[in-house]
Amino acid sequence: MKRKNLSSGWGSLALTLVMAVGLAGCGSDGTDGIDGKDGVNGAGQVISMQRLGRTASQGFDQSAAEIVAFEPAGKNIFAVNAQSGMIDVFSAADPTAPTLAQSIDLRTLLVANGKATDVALVGAANSVAVHGSFAAVAVEASPKTGAGWVVFLNVDSLAYVTAVQVGSLPDMLTFTPDGSKVVVAIEGEPEDYTVDPEGSVDIITVADFSLQRAGFREFNVGGSRAAELPAEVRVFGQIVDSNGQWVRASTVAEDVEPEYLAISADSQTAYVSLQENNAVAVVDLANARISKIFALGFKDHRLPGNELDVSDKDNQINIANWPVFGMFQPDSIATYRVNGIDYIVTANEGDSRADWGIAQSGGATDFAGDSLNLNMEEFRVKDLPLDPDAFSDAASLQEKAQLGRLKVSAQMGDTDNDGDFDELYVYGGRSFSIWNAATGERVFDSGSQMELLTANKYGTNFNNDNDENDADGRSDAKGPEPEGL
């Protein structure tokens, strides 16, 4: 999923000061690992944050302060002003009153330095990271299916250093902890599925700005590593013609869409979320090679502790168990090490391919009977034929106060291929999870805590749609929609 607006409705950039760090109500942590020491009782500790300063971003409702990076030596904040193709630099020398120091037009810089022929061919800025002397910015092309760029700026002078051309839709980037490389998640998101660019992880060596690419072609059908791709990795993209008619299935390399990445402390390994594919790729950075791909599996919302609210039209908080499965589909991820074991943390946001053209072989008709050349991925439960053996109470389940309004994937769930749905799969886990980075085993999931805690604090304003300020407005989609860590 392309980066979304993470700024507030006022389009402002806010600084916060963490006053105390801890986990509320944790109790004793016990023993960590085989040789770990006893944990510290954290029952009385809380997290408390207080806003220290605030400044208006450069544009209202335009993703104008979407991603930020702090440069400590100069006390500057680099903010991605996404749709304008700008980087806004704010001085935080006085953190109580940050001020705009400079806006850098990346489109003009790319043209002036011979990296692009016209500003119209340069799209949005998607990500920024800072390390040492450099700020690196991911910039997509226009259209986004073209090759994008990583622009390097000097953090002291804010001058252009160079730009490296990368794959289609560089969605997120970060420096390795040692600062030797910039690693870029190349999402390769299609515009309308007439073209589906390949996803990849692009690796730039900072010393000489050389580029290596870790791609996924070996996992294609017939590829040398096709057998290594777990069966539960979701691969279902399709190439269509200009009329939206099915031409062929996308390859694995075309279908995977690297979303976000985290780097191990030793700067040797990248962990990359493949959001739409419900998977994580592990990348050997030294050799620019995909080491393995983990399928993340599914969350059983029938189980105690995995409750969710599924309707935006029931005028109430109704966090309960329902006969659906959640696809974790993380956006941002992080990594850390405890007692020699590496772990991955995921924010299980979820994402569908509802806004891109997906036709079906032999014709395009949705389950409600309407002609359809777009959106063969996301449907509401009320519009799907449910298997009467799997759902004996299908008629009541499809009412709007129950599962009827819930958005699910039509690309999976017909387990016996008889044209109706035996299982229902929703987008996202409405949670965060911790995974063993070596095995891909899930060792923790926060279950229904996000919805329970926000409902307790905000009442029916939980699962709010920030665009419309609509209470309970996201319960039919991805609920609290955790995106960042």
Q: Which residues make up each language-model segment?
A:
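Bacterial N-terminal signal peptides that target proteins for export
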Residues: K2-A14
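Beta-sheet-rich non-transmembrane sensory/scaffold domains
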Residues: G27, A43-G484
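Initiator methionine at the very start of the polypeptide chain
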Residues: M1-K2, R337
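Collagen/collagen-like triple-helix recognition
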Residues: G27-G42
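C-terminal motif of bacterial Sec signal peptides marking the signal peptidase cleavage site
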Residues: G22-G25
